[in-house]
Amino acid sequence: MKPKTPRLLVQGSTFARAWQINRFIKAKICRSEGMKLVTLLAGLTFFCGVAFGDEKNVIQQAPKELPGQAPWWSIDLNSDYTLGSKIIKSGNFGSQAVYHYEIEALRNFHLFDKYYLQCGIDSERFDFSRSNSLYPSSISSMAAEVSFSYWTGEDFYPVLKLEPGFYYTGDHITPNSFDVPIRAVAGYQIWDKVHLVLGVDADPFEQEPVIPICGVNWKINDQYNLRAVFPQPRFSYTPNKTLEFFIAADLIGGGYRNGPTNDHRTNNALLDYSEYRAASGVNYNPQKGVSFEMTVGWSIARRFDYFRAGPDDAAKSAPYFKLDISIDL
């Protein structure tokens, strides 16, 4: 006969089992709560990693400017002052000085290979210290600029440039002062480091509506370069990457529509103003995309030519000073 188990022992065993089951359930619950906490912490860690890690990746993986990559913007500001000199045919008029500035801002759009479309504005002004019905107080232009240009890795060379805008004297902006000067230039390699440069400069407002551009560009070596191209020849010496010394010639001016005057010869007439200069100077490049060019030279001749109506006067030569600032962004 099987011996009976005492009732108290059975109840104690039952309580023990219940206690074990309760402990097991609590352990499960704690383990579940712990898993939830771990999951929450892992989620927060992942979120923070995404938030801050991606920002770091964005900063680290931002596209860097490649060597030779063209800038988005090209800005150029030049200003010069020509000391006073007398106009030869108007000795009683007195000595006339000239202050000149030009600002150009262009946005560069890549087309293909090394060719770019440049679009922007060009504003230029000449202010004269003396004026009358023959010689205006100022000559100005406000024009848009559209260029198809070649990027060498350091500079843009316009192949085709159009500058539609208003070319006027004083403050007389009128519909008949609208003009579209056009410049087309191409280079052809004829020998190693020697290029033939040919082109035309067309402007209906000038006495010669089409002016040829011709010459050669010879990169003698890494330090010397000869750009024998009319009308802006230049010989330069570059001892290092930050400095360039040069001698050069420059032709500035253009065709403009004169405003109303009391002289029938100049009243609303076309004026071809030109100034040919020779100079030497230095170009300083403290960093890529920034340059300062300082020039001291001689204004050989300044000319006021109302080629359709009569007066054609020139001023005597005089010294001038120029500062040119170029910034690429």
Task: Go through each PLM region and give its residues.
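Repeated loop/turn-to-beta-strand initiation elements of outer-membrane beta-barrel proteins
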Residues: 111-117, 154-158, 193-198, 223-226, ...
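Outer-membrane beta-barrel "beta-signal"
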Residues: 213-218, 223, 280-285, 315-329
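Membrane-embedded beta-strands of outer-membrane beta-barrel proteins
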Residues: 101-105, 144-146, 182-184, 214, ...
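Transmembrane beta-barrel domains of bacterial outer-membrane proteins
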Residues: 54-175, 179, 269-277, 310
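Residue-level signature of outer-membrane beta-barrel architecture
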Residues: 107-109, 148-150, 188, 202, ...
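Transmembrane beta-strands of outer-membrane beta-barrel pores
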Residues: 79-87, 121-127, 164-170, 200-206, ...
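Cleavable N-terminal export/targeting peptides
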Residues: 1-72, 329
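Outer-membrane beta-barrel translocator/channel fold
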Residues: 126-132, 231-314
